[in-house]
């Protein structure tokens, strides 16, 4: 595929993924109000409903990779987008909290399929010397959807009703499925009846575990940044988090080719060490300037870590196993957030908010050690 059609195909996959994440983001500020309001349930129910999608997201990523390798990237992305649209339709069903949990389980499965198969599709489109950059840019579809989705959901709710939010949550991924059907696919799936290996790729385990340790810092920032700054009387928590998010985007846009230019393993080591530094700056911040600086350092490192590790994964497997490898790898992101959030929460409960960030520092340093020892060996 020549350069221009490949760029058009990349843009299409990006838009499809962003539409799916817009549906996820639009419901984030709306579902808690719906559970506490019209349904009249508890805060515990809010937590269960909100987090249910992570269960199937984790489980379906390797399966999505398997489908992408054996049936094609497009069919896996379309199936995932349609599954996400079903989730939006299920929000309309008046089945209380159990019905919402089922809807969120469908959403997790759909989102997991779209991002996993989409990642493999993007790598198929990328020249070998630009894979790291395109992997990083593709990840911005997640940030775009989760950043723009919540205000869209709020706007729809205030202008209309819960039902219109559900309609948007169904319509956005449905539009994505229609777009995906028109994107050309270069990859040739396995012949009928031929299985391309197990659901879990062993080559992804060590990079995936490194990623899990690295995303503990994201869990700490997401849960306790604002609370830590408020506790110290610093405030500006929203601005500090915005600085973190903006740096993630800027580094992906301006420095997204670092893994391609200097190598994914050195980038992964450096990103882990710099992430630890940023988290330490946040933990010791005594004013807004120090907190924002720490958040920006953390954001720059966090932005580089994922594409570096993903590039290691795709470099170790043949094209026909790329989907399974990326499915296994991306599942470790969910695992890291799923286990890292209660880990830093326990640290905060026992020793205060600052302790949550020191635990994340230790995890980031652990990621650097693994990248320096284990990943260096696998690349040699």
Placement of each model-derived feature along the sequence:
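Helix-loop-helix hairpin linking two adjacent transmembrane segments in secondary transporters
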Residues: 138-181
